[in-house]
Design a protein with these regions (language model features):
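Short substrate-entry loop that stabilizes the transition state in hydrolases
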Residues: 69-71, 80-122, 212-213, 245-246
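Primarily recognizes the serine-hydrolase "nucleophile elbow" in alpha/beta-hydrolase
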Residues: 152-224
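Alpha/beta-hydrolase active-site loop
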Residues: 128-170
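Alpha/beta-hydrolase
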Residues: 77, 113-115, 206, 268
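C-terminal catalytic histidine-bearing segment of alpha/beta-hydrolase fold enzymes
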Residues: 262-304
């Protein structure tokens, strides 16, 4: 008797399932020795990891490229964002996912750290924007600017240093070949990390201090000028010309030039139509900066 259509579908599905199981087993027998030898498969989805920092348990997204490890790696530091969950018009996880493939295709592992109060670490403390607005409402603008500097030097820098320590001990990562990159407030943090850890191979700051901090706070200017002066790593400074201000990158580059320290300054044509668009060029215009940034990273980070 002929099988019913339902039975045929079930049989076909069952056969396909057995085939998938055999394929998975076969791939498993291949993958295990490859992983043992340090060969990994490129990740289409990130691994969500937890990074301890004092009493905090920060979340981060980690991608690794395909091929033979250990890999050079990038620790990326986001800015303060438009709110606790968003940056550049995207959720923070979407923003991380937009950047990761750019780094993976150049052979770099990519760790996107969520600091307290933001993104996947929103439950680990207050959002920095709320903290600074409250300080300004209670004590005034000058007090808020000073608090931002204090947090930059202490709590938030500690979090990034914890992320760096985590990355250095992660399987498949070459602890000797790590770059630190940051955007906006995260760009400031990247410069302070370069001052703190002489083993960082390179630093890239996108739009660091461009959102009013440079003009409004002499303390921030002094802190960042001292940081680039003390940093051992080569530094790249990147902005779009329609950012709020390009003075931070130009002034920091002038200081590096005065000190005869290796650096690269790139001011690109306008991105989008507004200062917000220009400020978020790291996310909105990856094709604009990709070639220059990876030429810099490949020179200073990739070599063993």
């Amino acid at each position: 008797m002929a099988a019913s259509p339902v039975a045929e579908v079930w049989a076909s599905s069952n056969a396909k399932a057995r085939g998938r199981a055999l394929t998975a087993a076969w791939l498993g027998w291949i993958a295990f020795p490859l992983l043992f030898l340090g060969i990994s498969f490129s990740q289409s989805a990130p691994q969500t990891v937890t990074i301890p920092c004092g009493n905090l348990h920060l979340k981060a997204l980690l991608w690794k490229p395909g091929g033979i490890g250990p890999f050079p790696a990038v620790l990326f530091n986001h800015g303060s964002g438009s709110d606790a969950e968003h940056t550049a018009g995207m959720t923070m996880t979407e923003a991380a996912g937009k950047l990761a493939p750019v780094f993976l295709r150049h052979g770099y592992a990519f760790l996107y750290l969520f600091r307290r109060g933001q993104g996947l670490s929103a439950d680990q403390g207050s959002y920095i924007g709320d903290v600074l607005r409250h300080e300004e409402a209670v004590k005034g603008a000058e007090a808020s600017q000073h608090l931002q500097l204090v947090l930059l030097r202490t709590d938030y820098l500690d979090e990034v240093m914890s992320g760096l320590a985590f990355l250095k001990t992660t399987s498949g990562i070459d602890a000797r070949r790590i770059a630190v990159i940051g955007h906006s407030f995260g760009g400031q943090l990247a410069l302070l990390v370069a001052q703190r850890d002489p083993k960082v191979r390179a630093t890239v700051a996108f739009d660091g201090a461009a959102h009013h901090s440079w003009q409004r706070s002499a303390e921030v200017r002094e802190e960042l000028l001292n940081a680039v002066g003390n940093a051992a790593a080569p530094i790249m400074l990147v902005q779009a010309s329609n950012d709020y201000s390009t003075a931070p990158s130009r002034d920091l580059a002038a200081e590096l030039e005065r000190l005869h320290k290796p650096h690269v300054l790139r001011i690109y044509p306008p991105v989008g139509r507004t200062p917000d668009d220009g400020h978020d060029a790291v996310y909105l215009a990856t094709t604009v900066w990709e070639e220059d940034v990876f030429q810099f990273l490949d020179k200073y980070v990739k070599p063993n």
